[in-house]
């Protein structure tokens, strides 16, 4: 699908459909839509009255033109109430438009953005671009019969007084971010019989070759030499060996250094504390954090910001066997902290313990980890919101602010000393589970805190809720969402002063 900017008059342009955006507050047709209504002898305004149409978010009014103008259809799509408008609504509405176009078997469409309420067209064209690409996504490679219809071109109509060259740069940024998120979705959606630890490391190697990243991949023997006892314990129950992956993007004019760590469980059965069938379903998505690392690297490989980025993944599988680790086992992490195992299904934090210790030894300016870590976070915040924790409030605030800009919902969960008491172990430095069933998302974050150098600002993002969805929402289809690829990439762009080059 091509996305192009244009400044056309729309009352006599040849296309399959012209989509006009409208706020619910609008009481009359204006501009190009008013001209088209006259050309259709009031066909649009008559249908609005007949259907009692209100431009609620995502609600369509489709008008066949019956050859009276060159466009086959004219459509209105609602933006909802103006006072509730935010840029993410444009992403959502763009995704609805692309799905409607596919439903109607349209090949080329125009989206008109000439609304006086729109002030920042950088944000308008980027949000629409992202929404189109994210909404167009489907994971259909394993279907024997597929819907082959594709929309070939979307033209986004902008006001003539806008700087088209500048806006094309934001279309490009939107394309890169959305394609990186879709790449992440593809990886998460692949089952464990297709992507295991070895194959995941091979994907990292392909990324490194394509974009010129530095890469180190450590095998089981090397992982043991590095003293990663917590990670190895989780991995040893599976016939698929662990692979520790370290990607590095290192530009010439680096403005700082950030390490990104992703939880990389190719599949999580729960181990000896085995999950029930309902809870084991979709556990291919327990690699979502690691896949997000790869998605972020794909984006920065294209955008080339002036900031050094480390991508770190401890890839493993948590399986029951005679070799599997057990409750009551005591493990030693890379940084020397000892861990008493309370439950083998709290394995992600064990792999992250060694990954965060490794990241801390790199002495970056900041560390971000992303993990489908706890069901407790889903209970606390629901399926659509990620939980954010960390050791530096300024850093947490920066991530939360960025998530508001990208439409990837996040909310802070507070650390406190009373919950720290709940991860004290009887016979080791720390328990891998809390001693009560309360505050589980936070106690997991507090566990991770013990493996991060306290001098390094660190944020933990629990994406257990929004990383994967059984029915989909907004521009996310059923399955993997690719969250939080756009948030973390956008944060890296801002931190590296990327937008100074284009005057944002």
Swiss-Prot record:
GO terms for cellular component: cytoplasm. One of its GO terms (molecular function) is metalloaminopeptidase activity. One of its GO terms (biological process) is proteolysis. It catalyses: Release of an N-terminal amino acid, Xaa-|-Yaa-, in which Xaa is preferably Leu, but may be other amino acids including Pro although not Arg or Lys, and Yaa may be Pro. Amino acid amides and methyl esters are also readily hydrolyzed, but rates on arylamides are exceedingly low; Release of an N-terminal amino acid, preferentially leucine, but not glutamic or aspartic acids. Binds 2 manganese ions per subunit. InterPro entries: Leucine_aapep/pepB, Macro_dom-like, Peptidase_M17_C, Peptidase_M17_leu_NH2_pept, Peptidase_M17_N. Mn(2+) 2 binds at residues 263, 268, 286, 347. The keyword Thylakoid does not apply. Its EC number is 3.4.11.1, 3.4.11.10. The keyword Metal-binding applies. Its cofactor is Mn(2+). Mn(2+) 1 binds at residues 268, 345, 347. Keywords: Aminopeptidase, Cytoplasm, Hydrolase, Manganese, Metal-binding, Protease. It comes from the Bacteria. It is found in: Cytoplasm. The active site is at residues 275, 349. Belongs to the peptidase M17 family. Presumably involved in the processing and regular turnover of intracellular proteins. Catalyzes the removal of unsubstituted N-terminal amino acids from various peptides. HAMAP family: Cytosol_peptidase_M17 (MF_00181). This is Probable cytosol aminopeptidase. The gene is pepA.
